[in-house]
Every structure is written in structure tokens, then in C-alpha cells.
From Swiss-Prot:
Subcellular location(s) per record: Cytoplasm; Cytoplasm, Cytoskeleton, Spindle; Nucleus
A single GO BP: cell division
Domain of life of the source: Eukaryota
A Gene Ontology molecular function term of the record: calmodulin binding
Chief place where the protein resides: cytoplasm
The keyword Iron-sulfur is annotated on this UniProt entry: no
Gene responsible for this protein: ASPM
A Pfam family annotated for this UniProt entry: IQ
Name assigned to this protein: Abnormal spindle-like microcephaly-associated protein homolog
Annotated IQ domain residues: 35-66, 175-206, 225-254, 248-277, 321-350, 344-375, 394-423, 417-446, 467-496, 490-521, 563-594, 613-642, 636-667, 686-717, 709-740, 759-790, 832-863, 855-886, 904-935, 927-958, 977-1006, 1000-1031, 1050-1081, 1123-1154, 1259-1288, 1282-1313, 1332-1361, 1408-1439, 1456-1487, 1506-1527
Organism, scientific name: Saguinus labiatus (Red-chested mustached tamarin)
InterPro entries the UniProt entry points to: CellDiv_DevSignal_Domain, IQ_motif_EF-hand-BS, P-loop_NTPase
A single cellular component GO annotation: spindle
PANTHER family: ABNORMAL SPINDLE-LIKE MICROCEPHALY-ASSOCIATED PROTEIN, MYOSIN MOTOR DOMAIN-CONTAINING PROTEIN
């Protein structure tokens, strides 16, 4: 009846909960719709207000910009003009100084060469004389040096012998000293060891002797005390024996009835308990066998089915990924080949252009040299022919012609340079704008990607928290028909398994109820028979125990009343607790059942609908998916619009701040300009007149300076001619004097020579003989010494050469061997590493399998042998800790090599490990549940036995209550198991689907990212090709070679990246299929580290090369800008405006391209999801509201386009005004052009242009190098961020795992503490009981002593003394014993007198003794009852605590699971947010740097244009003035 009532109540609760949930969901849906509508209206209002505000701000900014530009241009004009005046002054001064220096240098060189000739002649004579003297001195010095060397060698030999002897002696003395010291230390150590041994022996002897003396003393004292103790013991034992003799008959009479009742009761209860125990064990074993068989079959079916499904699914995924990888590889290789062909063609074209340029340059140089030579000859001829009179007129005419010619030449040059500069500027601006657009586009795409990821995460999280069924349905609707098909199959299989399992459970429950009914019937029959026997026994005993039962009945009734009241209170509280618990569990179960029932009912309805109307469902799904895709596109657009609006707001705010500061500055300057505006015309006229006067004055000053220089040159020539003639005269005179002196000396010398020769011949004969003898001797000695020296020197040279060769060969051999050994060791290490990793993987798999087997065996052993549970649990905990430590250590080793691994692989490994851990925890939880269930049943059985043994009267009630309670517990346990099984199945299915969807999503994201990067790369390459096509005419052979080298390196890097990517994909698939992740990860890490090292090395070399080329080009550029500062024209500003206008148009076109690209990307996704292609158009036509929204967006875009066109129109007006002013200036300038000089000066201008193009090409190359370096830096930074994120995830995961371990340990400690506290409590209660028992015994002893005293009262004192003396003498034979007994007898007499004194109060004492007896009996019964109640309460509390701990563990597990899920969600949100912020910061920084660079560059270009235009105007005006003067 109670089960039916509970079932009806649960049904009512289910229905009420269903109604409440439906109403709550409707209310929540309505609330969400209202919130969405309100948000949409607010967004529209905010955007309209923002657009209006932006239009106003742009108008104000345009006005401020126009004023600010005008002010900046005026300021720059004044500065440029001052600089031009200074440059002209310095240039003219430099020209005059140059002419003067040339002439002075020519004069000085002539003087220098002549003086050098004279000095050389004199020095030659001196040199010959000195040479002869030096030869003689050298011969003498060498002789003396050889003699000294011989002596030194002999002395060195003697010194070396003495030194070696001394060294040997010193070594010998040192060795002797060391040996003596060592011998001394060894002897000292030996003596110390001997001394320590002797000291130890002495100490041992002393301690033994002292111990012997102390033992003798202790033995003597011990014998004395022993004799005294023996006397006391004998006296006490005699007294105790007398007491026992009196107590035994009384206690025997009392114990006999109690013992007989106890024995009969015990036999009856033992038989009853044995029968109950046997029945319960037999039934438990039967049910256990059935349950295990059903469980094994269900697990085997589930595992087989899941493995089969997983294998099929993995095979399909692997084939898809393989096909996509093959397609990508083919596409990339074809693209690389095409790119190489294009680059080779470009290199050939650049070589041809360089060769033609070189040929033209050689022709131009030849012509230029010829022209210069002709001009020089012509000027010299004119200077010679013309007279001094016509010199001034000719000079004036020449200066006028030169000025006009130079002005024309400069104008032509500037014009061509301006055209080239305009082209280069337009190309560079286009390139810079394209780069900027690409960076902005990439940043927008990244922001959109991250925002979409965040949006999808938040949507998934909200849907998941609402209802699991809704999440599953939405995921299945979103992610494809394959997942739904798989889920349906799994659902059908699960339904079958659940139905089979529920059938088995229902049968099991029916059998349990049946056995419980039989047990209750047996208990009732046994109780009725026992009751009858007990009544008969009571009727027989009734007349004997009437008197006792009267008092006992009275006390028992009181006690029963109290116990009944207490029991009523306890039962009420207990029922309240049970009902509350039931209600809570029923509520939770009802909620869960409602959830799962709804999920089941929805799934069933969907299944029926699917079977009935498949085509309709497909159409609805496709329509829904199309709607979802469009909705997502719309959301993405909205998100992009919001991001763009925020970014533009930030940009406009920043611009507004800058404009405001510039507006304040402009206002200040504008007030000054307004004041000086009316004086501007007067100042302009004055300026023109001043410039004219300055030009005339400078011309006059230069002409005067040239005249002065001409005069000085003529004077220097005359002086030089005079000096030359004077030098010639002096030389002739000196030569004549020298000839006279030499002739006279020659004649006198001839006479003396003849006399001298006669004497000399005789002396020579004598000297020759003497010298011959001496020379022969010295030659012999020298020859001997030379041979010795040569042999020694050759020996030394050969020895040094041999030593060098030996060292080199040794080093080469060592290095070669080291390299060889290194290679061998590396190969061995790789082999060992691979084998070790493979063995580790196999060993880990074996360990895991072994662990699972041991766990299964442990579960069976726990069920069979409960006594070994604790030891087994300890063993398993130790084993688990060892495995955990091993995993930690292996994880630590893996993390060292896993620093640069991808985040997705980390996530996959983490999911696998968490799944394995979850499976192990699940098994342990099931084991723990089984163990707790066994413990609970065993404790319940034990409590039942004790309770029946203590009290028979309440046996029937307790049996019924326990049977009811057991049924409820089994029902609850069944419901819990069913609930947990359903939860686990649902969690497993959800986990499986999530894992599959995650893998699909990750693979799709990877393919998309690779494809997007490929598309971006293609677009970038196309733009780069356009830039290269524009720049290819300006490049030289060095640039082409450099580009080829760079291309080869880039191709190598691309090939390595592709190969690494292919290896990664293949390894990942093998990891998923074969589960050999450890081996693949290790090889991939090694390969990737090597690749990264190679790429970094190549990148560093490239960066260094680029940086060096950039530095060289920068230096060339600086030299070039110094030489060609006047190469920019006013037209550059206009063309720059034109280029900006074109860039705006290109930007619009890029926006259209971006939209088309997005459309194309969505179309690709649409093609990939083929099932959604048929019904998008139908739903698109039907969904007119969305079309209206899109039309509204298009109108908004049109409004923005109109505003932009209006702004462009204003800008065009300003440009047209500037263009008109430039055209007027050009008209005035073009009047002075001459066509003949244009053809003559065309070739040098072309060469200048080519040089300029080379420099610009170098500059663009440096910019490309910087961009590539920055991209590499960006990639490295992304890798570092990914690595940091991976380390943070790992640390978080380790923290979570440590936390889980800590919580499990904490719960185990709490359980142990509870057990220990119960044990302490039982111990204290036992102690209290023993203390009470002791006190009762003391009271009994006192009462018995009083009884003895009453008996001894009638005997005379003399008889008592005689009896005492006789007994004492009989017991103790010696006098000493008699004295001791006498003292004890005195004590007994005193005690007896005290007892006699107490007999006077006999009446009071009797009443007190009776009361004491009754109190004792009542107290004993009360203690026994209290102990029984306490034991029962303790057992109940223990049971309830165990259940509460179990519930708490389950609640903690659920909470931990929820907390883990929330933590993962928050961590992912934090990670995505952080990465988004990092990317946003990087994008903002890049944009700021790029804007600053563009603004500086633009200002520099404007400044150079204005400066060049001012210089040109001044030069042309001067040329015009000179021409007018000349005419």
C-alpha cells in the first residue's frame, strides 16, 4: 500500500513539475523575445544618433583641416624660401673656392715635382756612399755577432745543465718532505685508534663493575620487600577466601535462575539468527549472480557496439581528411611551380633591362666626355683668341647664356624627375594603402573570428544550462544529419538496453518483494511459536516469581512509559527525517525523471515524425539551417558593424582630440594671419624687388670675383714663368761651375792616380796574399758554422712544420671522429628513443589493461571476501598513488619536450586523460557503492541480531520496520542506480557527441584557417605581383639576384612548413586511429624543433642581409637626396591627391571584394554542407522581412556613400583650385622652354631617372624586408601566446586534478575521523559502564559486609578474638607473621567497634539497605536499557552518517563536475577574451605606427614638393632676369 501511495504521489509530483516547467519555459521565452526586440530598437536608435553625430564631426573636421593645411603650407613656404637663399649663397661660394683650389693645386704640384727631382738626385749620391759604408759595417757587425752567439750558446748549455740539476734536486727534496709528513700523519692516526680502543675498554669495565655493585644492592632491597609483600598477600588472600565462602552460596542461589533463563533465551535466539542468516546469504548470492550476469552482458554489448561505431566514424573522418590534404597539397605545389616560373621570367626581364640600361649609359658617358672635351677646347680657344678689351662683354654674354641654359636644364630635369616621382609616389602610395587595407582586413577578420567564437560559446553555454535535450536537438540540427543519424541509432540501442535492464530490475524487485514476504511470514510464525512457549514458561514461573514481578512490573511500567514517550518522540523525529529525505529524493528524482522523460518523449516524437514525414523534415531542416546561416551572417554583420562603429568612434574621438588641438593652434595662427593679411601684397612686392636686387647684386659680385680670380691667375702665371726661367738659369750656372770643378779635379786626380796605381799594385800584392790566407781561414770557419746553422734551422723548420701538421691532423681527426661518433650516437639515441617510447606506450597499455583486470578482480574479491576489503583498498590506493606519481613524472618529462606543441593536441590529450580518469573514477565509485551496500547490509544484519538478543518483546515491530525500511532502501537504491545509469548513459552519449563534434569542428576550423590563409596569401601575391610589375623596370641585377636568393629561401621555408604540416596531419590521424600519441609526439617535437631552428637561422640570415642592404641603400639614398633635392615638382601634390582619390575608390572596390569574398566563403561552406543547398532560395524568397532589413542596411550604406561622395566633391574642389594655380605657374614657366636643348639633354635625364628608380627599388625592397620581419615576429608572438595558453591550461588542469585528489583524501580522512570518534565514544561509554559496575560491586560488598557484621553481632567478643587468633596462627607460623596479624587484628577490632557503633542505627540502615537494593536493581536495569538504546542509536546514527556521507560524496561529485564545467567555460572565455585583446592591441599598435609613418612621409613629401617648386620658380625668375639683361 505504501509503495502504491508513493508511486501515485510521485506521479502527481511529476505531472505538477511538468506543468510548472512548461509554464516557466513559456514565460522565459516570452521574456527573451521582449528583450531581443528592445535591444534591436535601442541599437537602431543608437546607430542613427551615432551617424548624425559622425556627419557633424566630419564636417567640422574638414573645415579645420583646410585651415590647418593652409597655415602649414604658408609656414613651410617661408622656411623653404629662406633655405633656398642660403643654399644659393653657399653654392656660389663653393664654385669660386673650387676654381681657386684647382689652380693653386696645379701650381703646387709643379713646384713639388721639381723640388723632388733635385732632392732625389742629391739623395741618390748620398745613398751610394752610405751603402758602401754600410756594407763594410754590416760585415764587421755580423762577424762580431757570430762570435758573441757562439759564446752565448756555450754559456746557455752550461746554465741549462745547472738549472736542470737544481730542478731535480728541488723535486727530490719536496718528495722527501711530503713522504715524511704522510708517515707522521699515519702514525698519529694509528696511535689515536689504539688510545680510543683502550679508553672504550676501560669505560666498559667501569660500567660493568658499577652495574654489578648496584645489582647487589637492588637484590638485597628486593628480597626485603618481597618477604613483606608475601606476608601481606597471604593475609589478604585469607580474608578474601573467607568473604568468598560467605558470598558463594547466596550468589549461586541468585545466579541459577538468571543463568537458566539466559541459556534458554540464548539457544532460541542463536537458532533464530542462524536460520535468518542462512536464508539471507542464500538469497543474496542468488540475486548477486543474476545481477552480475545481466551487468556483464549489458557491458559487453555496449562496448562492442560503441567500438564498432567509433571505428566506422574514425574511418570516415580519416578518409575525408586524407582527400582534403591531397587536394590541398596538389593545389599548393601547383601554385609554387607557377610562382617559380613567374619569378624566373621576371628575373630574365630585369637582366635584359639592366643590360640595355648599361649600354645606354656607356653611350651617354662617351658623348658626355666628348662634349666636355669640346667645350673645354672651345672655351680655351675663345680665351686665347679674344682680346682683353672684349673679355667683359663676352663674359657677360657667357654668364647670361649659362644661366638660361642651366635654368632650362634644371627645368627639364625637374620636370622629368617630377613625372618619375609622381609615378613612384603613386605606386608606393597604392602599395602602402593596399598593405594598410590588408592589415585592417586581417585584423577585422581576426576580430570577427574571435567574436564569433565568443558568441557561439556563450550561446552554447546558455542552451546547455537551460536543458540538455534542447542542446542536443540544437546541436544535431546545426551540426548535421550524420550526428543525428548516429544519435538515433545509439538512442535506439540505449532504449533497448534500458528496456532490458528495466525488465531485469523489475523482475529482481519482484523476487526481492517475494523473498521479503516469505521472510516476514517466517519471522511472524517463529515469533508466534516463541510467544506461546514464553507464555507457558511465564505461567509455570508465575507463582514462584510473583513477589519479584510485582516490583519489577511497577518499575518496568514506569520505564516502559518513559521509553514509549522517548520512542514516540524519536520515531516522530525519525519519520520526519525520513519523510523529508524521501520528499527531497523524490523531488530530485522527479525533476531528473521529468527532464529525461521529456528528452525521451521529444526524441520519440521526433523519431515518429522522422519515420512518418522524412521529406518534410529534410525541407524544414534545410530551411532552418539556411535561416540559421543567414541569422549568423546577419549577427556577424551586426557584430562587424558594431566593432567598426566602436573602432571608428575611437578613431574619430582621437581625430577629434587632434583636430581640437590643431584647431586651437590654427585659431591662434589665424588671428595673426588676419592681422598680417592686408600687408601681404606689399610684402610680396617688396620681396620680389628684394629678390631682383639680390640677384643683380650677386651677379655683379660674382662677376667681380671672377675678374679678380682672372687677374690673380694671370699674375700667378707670370710669376710662375719668371720662377721657371730663374730656376733654369740657376741650374745652368750650377751645372757650369760643377763641370769646371770636376774637370780640374779630374785632371789633378789623373796625375795622382798614376802615382797611386804604382804604389797600389805593390801593396795589393802583399795585401792579397795576407788577405787570402786570412779569408781562407774565416771562410772555412764560416762554412762550418753555416752548415751547422742551416742544418739546425732546417731541422727546426721541418720540426715546426711537422708539429703544425701533426696538430692539424690531430684536430681534423678528432673533429672527424667526434662528428662520426656524434652521428652514430645520435642514430643510436634516436633508435633507443623510438624503441623506449614504443616500449613505454606498450607498457602503459599493458599496465592499463592489467590495472583494469586487477580492478575487476578486486571488485569480485570485495564481494566475496569482505574481511580483506580494507587491505585491498589500501593496496589499491597505494597502487593508484604510484600510478599517479608515474603519470605526473611522465607528464613532467613530456612537458619539457612539449613546449611548442599545438593547443588542439593538448586539448585532445587532456580530454583522453580526463575520460580515462573519469572511467576509473566511475569504476571505483561503483566498487565503493557495492562495498558500502555490503557494509550497510552487514551492519543492518548485526544490529538486527543484537536488537533481537537484547529485547524479545519488540522483535516483531522491529522486524516489520526493518523489512519496510529495507524495502524502501532497496527501492531508493534501485532508483539511484537507475538514475545514475540513465545519467551516465546520457553523459556518455553527450560526451561522445561532443567529442565527435569537437573533432569535426577543429578539423573544419583548421581547413578553413588553412584555406583562408591560402586565399589571403594568393591575394597578397597578386598584389605583390602588381607591385613587382610596376617596379620591375626600375630594378637592377643586384635586386634580381637578391630576389632570386630570397625566393629560393622562401621556397625552402614553404616546403619545410608544408612537409611539417603534412606530417602533423598524418601523425594526428594515426594518433586518433592507433592511439600511439607518445611516439608521434616525440618524433614531431624533434622534427619541429629542428625545423624551427633552421627557419629561425635562415630568417636571421635574411634579416641581416636585408638590414645590410637597407643600410647601404639608406646611405645611397641620403647621398642621392643631398645631390638631387631639387627633383620634386608642384604636380606631385595634385597627383598625390589623385592617387588618394584612386585609393579611396580602390578601398570601396576592396570593400565590395571583401563582401564578395565573404559570400564566396559562405558559398563554400554551403557546398560542404550539401544537404542545405536545395531550400535556401525558397526560404530566402519567403523571408521578406529579412530582405527589408537588408534593404534598410543598403539604404544606410547608400547614405554613407553619398556622404563620402560629398566629402570627395569638396576635396576635389580644393584640388581643382590648387591645380588651376599650378597651371598658371606652369604657363608662365613653359614660355621659357627651348625645344633644341630638350633633345640634347634627354639622355642624362633618363640616366638620372634610372638611378632614382634603382634607389626606389632598394627602398621598396627594404620595406618588404621590414614587413616580412614583422610578420615573422607576429607569428612568433602568436606561437608564444599559444605556448603560454597551453602552459596555463596545463597548470590549471594540474591544479584541478590536485584539488580533486585533495577532496577525495579529505573525504576519506573525514570518514576515518568519524569511525575513530565512534570508536572513542563507544570506548568512553564502555569505561563509564565499567566504572558504574565497579561502584555497584562496591555497594554490594559493603552490603554483604554489613550482613556479616549483623551475623557476628550475636557472638561474644572473646570468641571473636579467639577465632581471629586461631585463624591467624593457623595461617601464619612465625612470630613476625603473628605480630603482623596482631596489628591487622587490632585494625579489625577497630573496624568491628565501628560496625557495632553503626548497629545502633539498625532500623534506618535496613530501610536504607532495601532502598539501596532496589536502587541497584533499578540502576542496573536502567544502565542496561541506556546502553541498549545508546547502542541502537549509535548504530542508527552510524548508518545515517554513512548514508549522509554517501549522499554528500555524490553531491560533492555533482558539484565538482558542475564546478569543473563552469571553470572550463570561464577559462575558455578568459582565454578567448585575452587572445582577442592581444590581437586588438597589436592591431591598434600597428595601425598607430603605420599612421604615424604615413603622416610623416606625407608631410615630408609635401615639404620637398613645395621646396622644389620654390627653388624652380626662383631659378626661372633669375633666368628670366638674366635673359632680359642679356638681350
Amino acid at each position: 500500500l505504501r509503495g502504491n501511495q508513493v508511486h501515485q504521489g510521485s506521479k502527481m509530483l511529476k505531472s505538477s513539475f511538468l506543468v510548472i516547467q512548461v509554464m516557466f519555459r513559456r514565460w522565459k521565452r516570452r521574456k527573451m523575445q521582449l528583450q531581443v526586440k528592445a535591444a534591436v530598437t535601442l541599437q537602431r536608435a543608437f546607430r542613427e544618433w551615432h551617424l548624425r553625430k559622425r556627419a557633424k564631426e566630419e564636417k567640422s573636421a574638414i573645415v579645420i583641416q583646410s585651415w590647418y593645411r593652409m597655415h602649414k603650407q604658408l609656414q613651410k613656404y617661408a622656411y623653404v624660401r629662406a633655405c633656398v637663399v642660403i643654399i644659393q649663397k653657399r653654392f656660389r661660394c663653393f664654385q669660386a673656392q673650387k676654381l681657386y683650389k684647382r689652380r693653386k693645386e696645379s701650381i703646387l704640384t709643379i713646384q713639388k715635382y721639381y723640388r723632388a727631382y733635385l732632392k732625389g738626385k742629391i739623395e741618390r749620391t748620398n745613398y751610394l756612399q752610405k751603402r758602401a759604408a754600410a756594407i763594410q759595417l754590416q760585415a764587421a757587425f755580423r762577424r762580431l755577432k757570430a762570435h758573441r752567439l757562439r759564446r752565448q750558446i756555450r754559456a746557455a748549455c752550461v746554465i741549462q745543465s745547472y738549472w736542470r740539476m737544481r730542478q731535480d734536486r728541488v723535486r727530490f727534496l719536496n718528495h722527501r718532505k711530503i713522504i715524511i709528513k704522510l708517515q707522521a700523519h699515519v702514525r698519529k692516526h694509528q696511535q689515536l685508534q689504539k688510545y680510543k680502543k683502550m679508553k672504550k675498554a676501560a669505560v666498559v669495565i667501569q660500567t660493568r663493575f658499577q652495574a654489578y655493585i648496584f645489582a647487589r644492592k637492588v637484590l638485597a632491597s628486593y628480597q626485603k620487600t618481597r618477604s613483606a609483600v608475601i606476608l601481606l598477600q597471604s593475609a589478604y588472600r585469607g580474608m578474601q577466601a573467607r568473604k568468598m565462602y560467605i558470598q558463594i552460596p547466596t550468589s549461586v542461589i541468585k545466579i541459577q535462575p538468571y543463568y537458566r533463563a539466559y541459556v534458554s533465551k540464548k539457544e532460541f535466539l542463536s537458532l533464530k539468527n542462524a536460520t535468518i542468516k542462512l536464508q539471507s546469504i542464500v538469497k543474496m548470492k542468488q540475486t548477486r549472480k543474476q545481477y552480475l550476469h545481466l551487468r556483464a552482458t549489458a557491458v559487453f554489448i555496449q562496448q562492442h557496439y560503441r567500438s564498432k561505431k567509433l571505428a566506422a566514424q574514425k574511418r570516415e573522418e580519416y578518409m575525408q581528411m586524407r582527400e582534403s590534404c591531397i587536394k590541398l597539397q596538389a593545389f599548393v605545389r601547383g601554385y609554387l611551380v607557377r610562382k617559380q616560373m613567374r619569378l624566373q621570367r621576371k628575373a630574365v626581364i630585369s637582366l635584359q633591362s639592366y643590360y640595355r640600361m648599361r649600354k645606354a649609359r656607356q653611350c651617354y658617358l662617351k658623348m658626355y666626355k666628348v662634349v666636355i672635351i669640346i667645350q673645354n677646347y672651345y672655351h680655351s680657344y675663345k680665351a686665347q683668341v679674344n682680346q682683353r678689351k672684349n673679355f667683359l662683354q663676352v663674359k657677360k654674354a657667357a654668364t647670361c647664356l649659362q644661366a638660361a641654359y642651366r635654368g632650362y636644364k634644371v627645368r627639364q630635369l625637374i620636370k622629368q624627375q617630377s613625372i618619375a616621382a609622381v609615378k613612384i609616389q603613386s605606386a608606393f602610395r597604392g602599395y602602402s594603402k593596399r598593405v594598410r587595407y590588408q592589415s585592417v582586413l586581417q585584423s577585422i577578420i581576426k576580430i570577427q573570428r574571435w567574436y564569433r567564437a565568443y558568441k557561439t560559446l556563450s550561446d552554447i553555454r546558455t542552451h546547455f544550462l537551460k536543458t540538455k535535450a534542447a542542446v542536443i536537438s540544437l546541436q544535431s540540427a546545426y551540426r548535421g544529419w550524420k550526428v543525428r543519424k548516429q544519435i538515433r541509432r545509439e538512442h535506439q540501442a540505449a532504449m533497448k538496453i534500458q528496456s532490458a535492464f528495466r525488465m531485469a530490475k523489475a523482475q529482481k524487485q519482484f523476487r526481492l518483494f517475494k523473498t521479503a514476504a516469505l521472510v516476514i511470514q517466517q519471522h511472524l510464525r517463529a515469533w508466534s511459536t516463541g510467544r506461546k512457549q514464553h507464555m507457558q514458561y511465564i505461567e509455570l514461573r508465575h507463582p514462584v516469581l510473583m513477589l519479584q514481578s510485582m516490583w519489577k512490573g511497577k518499575t518496568l511500567r514506569r520505564r516502559l512509559q518513559r521509553q514509549h514517550k522517548c520512542a514516540v518522540i524519536i520515531q516522530s523525529y525519525y519519520r520526519m527525517h525520513v519523510q523529508q529525505k524521501k520528499w527531497k529524493t523524490m523531488k530530485k528524482a522527479a525533476l531528473l525523471i521529468q527532464k529525461y522523460y521529456r528528452a525521451y518523449s521529444i526524441g520519440r516524437e521526433q523519431h515518429h515524425l522522422y519515420l512518418e514525414t522524412k521529406a518534410a523534415v529534410v525541407t524544414l531542416q534545410s530551411a532552418y539551417r539556411g535561416m540559421k546561416v543567414r541569422k549568423r551572417i546577419k549577427d556577424c554583420k551586426k557584430a562587424a558593424v558594431t566593432i567598426q562603429s566602436k573602432y571608428r568612434a575611437y578613431k574619430t574621438k582621437k581625430k577629434y582630440a587632434a583636430y581640437r588641438s590643431s584647431a586651437i593652434i590654427i585659431q591662434r595662427w589665424y588671428r595673426g594671419i588676419k592681422i598680417t593679411n592686408h600687408q601681404y601684397k606689399e610684402y610680396h612686392s617688396l620681396k620680389k624687388t628684394v629678390i631682383k636686387i639680390q640677384a643683380v647684386y650677386r651677379g655683379i659680385r660674382i662677376r667681380r670675383h671672377i675678374q679678380h680670380m682672372h687677374r690673380a691667375a694671370t699674375f700667378i702665371k707670370a710669376m710662375f714663368k719668371m720662377h721657371q726661367s730663374r730656376i733654369r738659369y740657376h741650374t745652368m750656372r750650377k751645372a757650369a761651375i760643377v763641370i769646371q770643378v770636376r774637370y780640374r779635379a779630374y785632371y789633378q786626380g789623373k796625375m795622382q792616380r798614376e802615382n797611386y796605381l804604382k804604389i797600389l799594385r805593390a801593396v795589393n800584392v802583399l795585401q792579397a796574399n795576407f788577405r787570402g790566407v786570412r779569408l781562407r781561414r774565416t771562410l772555412r770557419n764560416l762554412q762550418i758554422a753555416a752548415t751547422v746553422i742551416q742544418s739546425n734551422y732546417r731541422r727546426y723548420r721541418e720540426q715546426t712544420y711537422f708539429n703544425k701538421l701533426k696538430k692539424i691532423t690531430k684536430t681534423v681527426q678528432q673533429r672527424y671522429r667526434a662528428v662520426k661518433e656524434r652521428n652514430i650516437l645520435f642514430q643510436r639515441y634516436n633508435k633507443l628513443r623510438h624503441s623506449v617510447i614504443y616500449i613505454q606506450a606498450v607498457f602503459r597499455g599493458m599496465k592499463a589493461r592489467r590495472h583494469l583486470k586487477t580492478m575487476h578482480l578486486a571488485a569480485t574479491l570485495i564481494q566475496r571476501r569482505f574481511r580483506t576489503l580494507m587491505m585491498r583498498r589500501r593496496f589499491l590506493s597505494l597502487k593508484k598513488t604510484a600510478i599517479w606519481i608515474q603519470r605526473k613524472y611522465r607528464a613532467h618529462l613530456c612537458t619539457k619536450h612539449h613546449l611548442q606543441f599545438l593547443l588542439l593536441q593538448n586539448a585532445a590529450i587532456k580530454i583522453q586523460s580526463s575520460y580515462r580518469r573519469w572511467m576509473i573514477r566511475k569504476r571505483m565509485r561503483e566498487m565503493h557503492r557495492a562495498a558500502t551496500f555490503i557494509q550497510a547490509t552487514f551492519r543492518m544484519h548485526r544490529v538486527h541480531r543484537r536488537y533481537q538478543a537484547l529485547k524479545q518483546a519488540s522483535a516483531m515491530i522491529q522486524q516489520q520496520y526493518q523489512a519496510n525500511r529495507a524495502a524502501k532502501l532497496q527501492r531508493q537504491h534501485y532508483l539511484r542506480q537507475r538514475h545514475s545509469a540513465v545519467i551516465l548513459q546520457a553523459a556518455f552519449r553527450g560526451m561522445k557527441t561532443r567529442r565527435h563534434l569537437k573533432s569535426m569542428h577543429s578539423s573544419a576550423v583548421r581547413i578553413q584557417s588553412r584555406f583562408r590563409s591560402l586565399l589571403v596569401r594568393r591575394r597578397f601575391i597578386s598584389l605583390k605581383k602588381a607591385a613587382i610589375f610596376i617596379q620591375r623596370k626600375y630594378r637592377a641585377t643586384i635586386c634580381a639576384k637578391h630576389k632570386l636568393h630570397q625566393f629560393l629561401k622562401l621556397r625552402k621555408a614553404a616546403i619545410t612548413i608544408q612537409s611539417s604540416y603534412r606530417r602533423l596531419m598524418v601523425k594526428k590521424k594515426l594518433q586518433e586511429v592507433h592511439r600511439a600519441a607518445v611516439l608521434i609526439q616525440a618524433t614531431f617535437r624533434m622534427h619541429r624543433t629542428y625545423l624551427t631552428f633552421q627557419t629561425w637561422k635562415h630568417a636571421s640570415i635574411l634579416i641581416q642581409q636585408h638590414y645590410r642592404t637597407y643600410r647601404a641603400s639608406k646611405l645611397q639614398r641620403e647621398n642621392y637626396t643631398k645631390q638631387w633635392r631639387s627633383a620634386v615638382i608642384i604636380q606631385a601634390a595634385y597627383r598625390g591627391m589623385k592617387a588618394r582619390q584612386l585609393l579611396r575608390e580602390k578601398h570601396k572596390a576592396a570593400v565590395i571584394i571583401q563582401s564578395t569574398y565573404r559570400m564566396y566563403r559562405q558559398y563554400c561552406l554551403y557546398q560542404n554542407l550539401q544537404w542545405a543547398t536545395k531550400i535556401i532560395q525558397e526560404k530566402y524568397r519567403a523571408n521578406k522581412k529579412k530582405h527589408k532589413a537588408l534593404q534598410h542596411n543598403e539604404l544606410k550604406k547608400a547614405e554613407t556613400c553619398v556622404q563620402a561622395s560629398f566629402q570627395d566633391m569638396n576635396i576635389k574642389k580644393l584640388i581643382q583650385e590648387q591645380h588651376q594655380t599650378s597651371i598658371i605657374i606652369q604657363k608662365h614657366c613653359k614660355a621659357f622652354k627651348i625645344k633644341k636643348h630638350y633633345l640634347h639633354l634627354r639622355e642624362p635625364v633618363v640616366s638620372i631617372q634610372r638611378r632614382y628608380r634603382k634607389l626606389t627599388a632598394v627602398h621598396t625592397q627594404a620595406v618588404i624586408c621590414i614587413q616580412s620581419y614583422y610578420r615573422g615576429f607576429k607569428v612568433r608572438r602568436d606561437i608564444q601566446n599559444m605556448h603560454l595558453a597551453a602552459t596555463r591550461i596545463q597548470s590549471f588542469y594540474r591544479m584541478h586534478r590536485a584539488k580533486v585528489d585533495y577532496q577525495t583524501k579529505k573525504t576519506a580522512i573525514v570518514v576515518i575521523q568519524n569511525y575513530y570518534r565512534l570508536y572513542v565514544r563507544v570506548k568512553t561509554e564502555r569505561r563509564n559502564f565499567l566504572a558504574v559496575q565497579k561502584s555497584v560491586r562496591t555497594i554490594q560488598a559493603a552490603f554483604r559486609g554489613m550482613k556479616v557484621r549483623q551475623k557476628l553481632k550475636n557472638v561474644s567478643q572473646e570468641k571473636i578474638a579467639a577465632i581471629v587468633n586461631r585463624s591467624a596462627l593457623y595461617c601464619y607460623g612465625s612470630k613476625a607473621q603473628c605480630e603482623a596479624v596482631g596489628s591487622e587484628g587490632v585494625i579489625i577490632q577497630e573496624w568491628y567497634k565501628a560496625s557495632c557503633f553503626a548497629c545502633s542505627q539498625e532500623a534506618e540502615y535496613r530501610s536504607q539497605s532495601r532502598a539501596a537494593v532496589t536502587i541497584q536493581k533499578a540502576f542496573r536495569r536502567m544502565i542496561t536499557r541506556k546502553l541498549d538504546t545508546r547502542k541502537c542509536a549509535a548504530l542508527r546514527i552510524q548508518f545515517f552518517l554513512q548514508m549522509a556521507v554517501y549522499r554528500r560524496r555524490r553531491a560533492n561529485f555533482v558539484q565538482q563536475k558542475r564546478a569543473a564545467v563552469t571553470l572550463q567555460h570561464y577559462f575558455r572565455m578568459w582565454q578567448t577574451r585575452k587572445q582577442f585583446l592581444l590581437y586588438r592591441k597589436a592591431a591598434v599598435v600597428l595601425q598607430n605606427h603605420y599612421r604615424a609613418f604615413l603622416s610623416g612621409k606625407h608631410q615630408r613629401q609635401v615639404y620637398l614638393q613645395i621646396r622644389s617648386s620654390v627653388i624652380i620658380i626662383q631659378a626661372r625668375i633669375k633666368g628670366f632676369i638674366q635673359k632680359r639683361k642679356f638681350q
